[in-house]
Structures are given as structure tokens and as C-alpha cells.
A protein has these predicted regions:
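Short sequence motifs at beta-strands and strand-loop junctions characteristic
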Residues: 2-7, 93-102, 152-154
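Outer-envelope beta-barrel architecture signal
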Residues: 8-10, 19-21, 99, 121-125, ...
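Outer-membrane beta-barrel pore domains and translocons
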Residues: 17, 28-30, 130-134, 165
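Repeated loop/turn-to-beta-strand initiation elements of outer-membrane beta-barrel proteins
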Residues: 20-24, 115-116
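Membrane-embedded beta-strand positions of outer-membrane beta-barrel proteins
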Residues: 25, 127-129, 162
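Extracytoplasmic gating/loop element in the C-terminal half of outer-membrane beta-barrel translocons
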Residues: 30-121, 125
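C-terminal beta-signal and terminal closure region of outer-membrane beta-barrel proteins
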Residues: 59-71, 88-90, 134-166
Length: 166
């Protein structure tokens, strides 16, 4: 059916500093196909119980068209009430382009001028702001292409900090 082993894993770190300010960006990327576990559990898995995913409606419409025309034109499996088609079995339907590019870490900092540090009896005094997982560019329809199989995206995290020495 496919493999979610990465074809490539990439990283890019960009850093710059100017007049006491520093900026650092870290991007990571993976190029691969991915099993969409969210799609697996929401589209057809509960077919014989409870609520149903909206893909079921598309498949039902395609089946009505099939009865009329003899041609089944849908990208979703043909469901049955008794699950005899094994809609929830692994198939190409659940494989997607799981490639992504993510801004993993952004850090902006400012190092205090030497004169101010000397007055405060400090060394290497720096304040900074750091953010993680700010954005992801992907065609993957699940929650997160990096944490496959989990129903939640990676959280954004924000940190303010102070570094100094004596």
C-alpha cells in the first residue's frame, strides 16, 4: 500500500546578529507519504455503530450513481451496511502526501550593552523570546504530519527568558 518511511529529512538553521540583537530560525522538513490515522478513524471506522463521517455521504451518492450508470466514480471505498467491503481495512485511500515544512523554532534576543552589564555586575546579560511550531506548510489533511497517528497537532509554545552570568 505504501510506506511512511521518509524519502528525505531536511533541516535549515539561519542565524544573524546586529548591534546586540540576534535572530535564529530553525526549519525542519520531511518528504514522505503518510498513513492518515485521523481519516481512518473518522471516515468509515464507526460504520456499524454511532456517528458517521461525511465521507460516507459522498460514497453513498457515488453508489446511487453506480446503480443508475453502472460506473462507481468515487475516491472513497464503496461502503456497505454490514461492513462486508472492509471499508476500515488498510488501503491507498488512507495514504496521503505527508511532506511538510515547519518553522520549528524562532528565537529573537537582545544582549545588553557592555556598559550596562558592568554597572549591574553582570556578564553576557541577554533577554530573549522563543516560539516553537509557529507554522507548518503541508497538504496532509490530518492533525499533524510530524506526529502521525495522534489526533492533535503539535502545540505552539512561547518562552520569554533572561540569561546572565556574574
Amino acid at each position: 500500500v505504501g510506506s511512511d518511511l521518509p524519502k528525505a529529512q531536511l533541516g535549515l538553521n539561519i542565524g544573524a546578529d546586529w548591534k546586540g540583537f540576534d535572530l535564529n530560525l530553525f526549519f525542519n522538513s520531511i518528504i514522505r507519504d503518510a498513513w492518515n490515522n485521523s481519516k481512518f478513524y473518522t471516515d468509515f471506522f464507526p460504520l456499524w455503530t454511532g456517528n458517521h463521517g461525511t465521507q460516507l455521504l459522498d460514497a453513498a451518492k457515488a453508489y446511487e450513481d453506480y446503480l443508475r450508470t453502472g460506473y462507481y466514480a468515487s475516491d472513497v471505498p464503496a461502503p456497505t451496511v454490514d461492513n462486508s467491503n472492509s471499508e476500515n481495512e488498510g488501503s491507498q485511500y488512507y495514504i496521503e502526501d505527508g511532506s511538510f515544512l515547519r518553522l520549528k523554532t524562532l528565537t529573537v534576543g537582545y544582549t545588553l550593552p557592555r556598559k550596562i552589564q558592568d554597572k549591574l555586575f553582570l556578564k553576557n546579560a541577554r533577554i530573549y523570546f522563543q516560539a516553537q511550531n509557529l507554522f507548518t506548510i503541508t497538504r496532509y489533511s490530518g492533525a499533524d504530519p510530524e506526529g502521525l497517528g495522534y489526533p492533535y497537532a503539535l502545540p505552539r509554545q512561547y518562552t520569554f527568558g533572561i540569561q546572565f552570568g556574574f
